[in-house]
């Protein structure tokens, strides 16, 4: 074997395979593996491109990489980042691929090409050079180094901010509806800050996700007798019955004016109770509402009204009726 491959101190790599870390650490294994092209033993380098990435290693020897001007790991062109076949077809390069039958013939061909590294492999046209220049990848895609087996979602991104940014090995997307119920430990969401299901991070994510993807509108209370909606933080200019009535009629077009039975204004607290004729009308309006909405240029808050407390006299009458 030639001394070129045996005494190699650094591999021939593209920037994507090398990774963004300037203080990378590599392991060197002389004659550790056979080249996948010429079958000769060569020095294998192994390293980790960055935190959360897969370990990479060289797959072909330096001679084959220099002959084809490719990366020893991804086998893509060092200048354009394209496969060898695409590059050669675009540039019109007709290079001898060498023998493919015998391992000895492959090794002999590699030794011969090693002595001719300084010679040109072929000629290329200006049109071909312009074509591969346009097809070249302008930006380094470090996402290729992310773990293939990790399909988990990032919980920090679901909360609204992930400090790791593009270097995060987990998916930056919100879960679908079938991933939300329960948020069990076996769900497809990664929680990097705490492993327990009762941790604050998991509870925060569950609260945010369920609040953002829950059913639209205000959930109706269990008490079927409640037919009113409560509005607070009303602006003074809209603290009038016609303004509030028109707000609900515009919000829910199926509603009619007679469907709103009455509106009780509490001017001292800038709030109001909107009483509907039936429970169905109240639920129709509630489905179009959100806990926080805007009326004019100010934010208002909406919620269902509460049940009336049962008076003591009514309680006594009910008890007497039960005794009788």
Swiss-Prot record:
InterPro entries: Cwc2/Slt11, Nucleotide-bd_a/b_plait_sf, RBD_domain_sf, RRM_dom, STL11/RBM22-like_N, Torus, Znf_CCCH, Znf_CCCH_sf. It is found in: Nucleus. SMART domains: RRM, ZnF_C3H1. Residues 185-201 have a biased composition (Low complexity). GO terms for cellular component: Prp19 complex; U2-type catalytic step 1 spliceosome; U2-type catalytic step 2 spliceosome. Keywords: Metal-binding, mRNA processing, mRNA splicing, Nucleus, RNA-binding, Spliceosome, Zinc, Zinc-finger. A zinc finger (C3H1-type) spans 149-175. Residues 227-317 form the RRM domain. Residues 173-206 are annotated as: Disordered. Its main location: nucleus. One of its GO terms (molecular function) is zinc ion binding. GO terms for biological process: mRNA processing; RNA splicing. It holds the Pfam family RRM_1. Belongs to the SLT11 family. Associated with the spliceosome. Involved in pre-mRNA splicing. Facilitates the cooperative formation of U2/U6 helix II in association with stem II in the spliceosome. Binds to RNA. This is Pre-mRNA-splicing factor SLT11. The lineage of its organism: Eukaryota, Fungi, Dikarya, Basidiomycota, Ustilaginomycotina. The gene is SLT11.
């Amino acid at each position: 074997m030639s001394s070129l491959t045996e005494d190699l101190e650094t591999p021939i790599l593209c920037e994507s395979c090398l990774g963004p870390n300037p203080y990378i650490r590599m392991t060197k294994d002389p004659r550790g593996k056979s080249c996948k092209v010429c079958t000769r033993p060569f020095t294998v380098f192994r390293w980790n491109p960055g935190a959360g990435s897969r370990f990479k290693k060289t797959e072909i020897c330096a001679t084959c990489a220099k002959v084809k001007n490719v990366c020893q790991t991804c086998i893509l062109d060092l200048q354009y980042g394209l496969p060898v076949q695409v590059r050669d077809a675009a540039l019109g390069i007709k290079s001898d691929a060498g023998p493919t039958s015998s391992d000895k013939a492959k090794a002999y061909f590699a030794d011969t090409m090693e002595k001719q590294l300084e010679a040109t492999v072929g000629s290329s046209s200006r049109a071909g050079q312009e074509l591969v220049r346009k097809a070249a990848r302008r930006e380094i895609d470090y996402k290729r180094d992310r773990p293939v087996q990790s399909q988990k979602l990032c919980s920090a991104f679901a909360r609204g901010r992930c400090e790791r940014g593009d270097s995060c090995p987990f998916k930056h997307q919100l879960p679908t509806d079938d991933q939300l119920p329960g948020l069990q430990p076996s769900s497809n969401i990664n929680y990097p800050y705490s492993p327990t299901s009762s941790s604050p991070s998991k509870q925060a994510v569950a609260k945010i996700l369920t609040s953002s993807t829950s059913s639209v509108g205000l959930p109706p209370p269990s008490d079927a007798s409640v037919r009113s909606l409560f509005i607070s933080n009303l602006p003074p200019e809209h603290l009038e019955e016609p303004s509030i009535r028109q707000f609900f009629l515009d919000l829910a077009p199926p509603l009619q004016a007679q469907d709103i039975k009455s509106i009780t204004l509490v001017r001292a607290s800038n709030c109001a109770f909107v009483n509907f004729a039936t429970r169905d009308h109240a639920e129709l309006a509630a489905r179009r509402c959100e806990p926080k909405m805007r009326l004019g240029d100010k934010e208002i808050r909406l919620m269902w009204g509460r049940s009336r407390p049962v008076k003591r006299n009514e309680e006594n009458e009910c008890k007497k009726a039960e005794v009788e």
